[in-house]
Amino acid sequence: MSTDLKLTPIRDSNCTLCPLGGMASSERDVCRVGSEPTPYLIVTKNPPSEKMKDEIFSYLEEVGFSRDDFSFTAAVKCRVWDANITKTMTKTCANEYLSQEVQRHKYKWILAFGNEALQATAGKAQVTKYRAQVHPCTHRSETKVFPTIAPGAVSRNPGQRASFIADLTYFRTLSEDAGGTSKRLPDRIRMITSPTGLKALRDDLLTCDGFAFDIETNGFNEYEADSQVVSLALSTWDKGATEPQRCYAVPLEHPESAFRGRSREVLEVLGKYMGTPKRRVAHNGKFDLRWLHEFGCHFDLTFDTMLAAHLLDENRAKGLKPLARSLLNVPPWEMETKALQDEDLKKVLKYNALDTWYTAHLYFIFRDQLVNEQPRLGKLMQMMSVPASNIFTEIERKGIWVDREILQTNAKIAEETLADIDSKLMAHVPHRDEWPDNLKEVNFNASNFARWLLFEHLGLPVIARGKDKEDGSPGNPSMAEGVLQMLNKRHPHEVLDLLLSRVKWQKFSSSFFSSYLDQIDDNDRIHTTFKLTGTVTGRLSSGKGDADKVTGRVSNRGVNLQQVPRDKFVKGVFGGAPGHVFLECDYSQVELRVAAAIAREPTMISLYQNNEDIHMATAMKMTGKPASQVTGDERKKAKPVNFGFLYGMSANTFVDTAWNNYGVEVTPHEAEVFRRAYFEQFPKLLDWHRRQRALAQKFGRVESPLGRVRHLPDIYSPDRKVAAEAGRQAINSPVQSFASDLAILALVNITRDFKRKGLKAFSVGAVHDALNFEVPEDEVRIAAPLIKYHMENVPLMKHFGYHMPVPILGDVALSRYWGDKEEVPEDILLDEGKFDKWLKSHGL
């Protein structure tokens, strides 16, 4: 069978089936098909280009197909790539030609890429809903259709690549009856409907070696009044097993459940035994444990397949369904989860049970990889990821305390201030007769009205523009906050002052206070979500949706604590509940310290070992002055120099970064001088940059000192920009992941020490390089030094065999409110008498 492709001209260049017919001609060929009949037909929206054809083939070959297996055709035969082709046209018009092809060649399977292809071949819409499922072909009953997203969607969003490959892998299993590693369904799902069934489950929990569990709920927030657990499922196994052996499903708050109205009682009983087995596994178990703990079922995880999947390959999709498709070759088991209590009970229980069954299979795969193939990652999983997940379960349940009265007062002030700003801005708006015809209403946001007001009516100069328009004309004048700040510095104007102030107060009002007022609970606390798998570097993220947990439902639980502004007006609404103190311990220059260690840069290491000021040292190098003559502004400029050039930033990029991130104005010439001086002072950083890029080129990955891996397949991209970005990630990823892992390891040790000492202090979260705590007033004298000690003394050598050549320092600050926190000098913190006086002098 030939792999050559031939081109077939359009059937009828004078076609009038749809409005696109008049655009067609016979000058070019439009439909690509194999030169001989093939078992599989690929259908795309439009005829694929040669580049896209080769890209599709590379995906198919990756999962084990041959090019000889496929023909190509298009749902739409017209050459007009930018035409507004509707699904109706695809279904009612273009199908006439497609139907002839399918019937003539008698294809066994159609691989439909994208919505239009799915519509044309199976008569269905929403490829995201029907992907990776088998559908009958509307043109030939013997032909089966397997839809997935279009390759172009993967090109636009590389994050979808893993799930796309998972779909193709499953398609190969189905179409070739490959079998392979496909995992069988459980022989039986034991649906527990009586006390006798609960007793049988209890007996299994008392003797089994481990289990995987999952719950189905009626929402995302366990603390809400109407929250209910719809069902609980478990898959268990005995010691020495290599796959799950038994599967249970317990109906709870479902109309057809025998335990309806008694779910808390059932969960409390099961909770007495679920902590007994040595291995307790879930996929994104933090979600499940929040709910189970809320309903009296208390135990901790020992393994989480989502955490393991992320550690082993941070680039792949981490949802249970795509992992099961790609690693287990199992059929989809999707269902609509928005209203489970309205669904048939048996359907819900089967869905719930299969979640646990395949989670258990993934557990055995990942456990083997972490123990036998990637033991350093296994150590991170054991020492950090799983314990941290259990800790964040409780952090998320408790939430962070908010002073409701201050919140309401500040929200009102923000609204009034915003209204006052708008009133003052209106004084600068000319009469409606002077407006251009295209402007219909006043809009002080980044709008055409605001651009006209600034750059035409007021005549302020344009110092930056957006991207050029499609017709080649210059882009619109930029209204970015940093650009307006720079413009105001160069050309001060009251309107610019007001607009910049408006940006600030609008954020306060809409992005923060409005959200906080909606989310504060009856206990004056706001709950959020912390993601240990939210970034490819491993850095903790906050406030993400729980979409990985339940397909089809997204909930932004609480605030993103990482984005709470430093401004006291916002930060000051958070604090310690009555009788408590808010404490923050922040790592000092941790990325610079970690980079110095990884790069083995002797000058940086020496500065930190001698407790010298690295920003002052850099300022001295930049200016050629002794420390006594360096001005405050010169030292201020050294800070962005140290953090900006650390990873090899260009001088041009530094100009924007220094202004946008640090408010420091630097000329292009100064940036060049600073960059040269920086690497003259720390020359080994350049050697480190080259070393990291070389490692990425050789292995396609780099590692942190603790063994966390950053896979960088883009380092081999023919696109120079893409490859260059991968090279930059090879440098900064190990630093950022190591710094983040230090904080999480410290949190694990702090929490354990709290429990050992019987302290009631607890963490309320982590923000960047800092850990935040709520501490009872009578425990501050014990907890504060303890927190600082553990942040500065993570046992890296003991657990990971790594010696840190520079000291890691943590600065403790505390107050009633987050926005009022004040740093406690180390000599005072570590002296019980001095610390006691300091606390009393601060009213604590």
Regions found by a protein language model. Name each.
Residues 1-6, 178-200, 816-844:
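Acidic, low-complexity intrinsically disordered tails
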Residues 2-178:
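A polyanion-binding, active-site-adjacent surface
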Residues 118-119, 219-223, 232, 286-297, ...:
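Short active-site loop/helix that positions an aromatic residue
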Residues 173-253, 276, 315, 327, ...:
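Conserved "right-hand" nucleotidyltransferase catalytic core of DNA-directed polymerases
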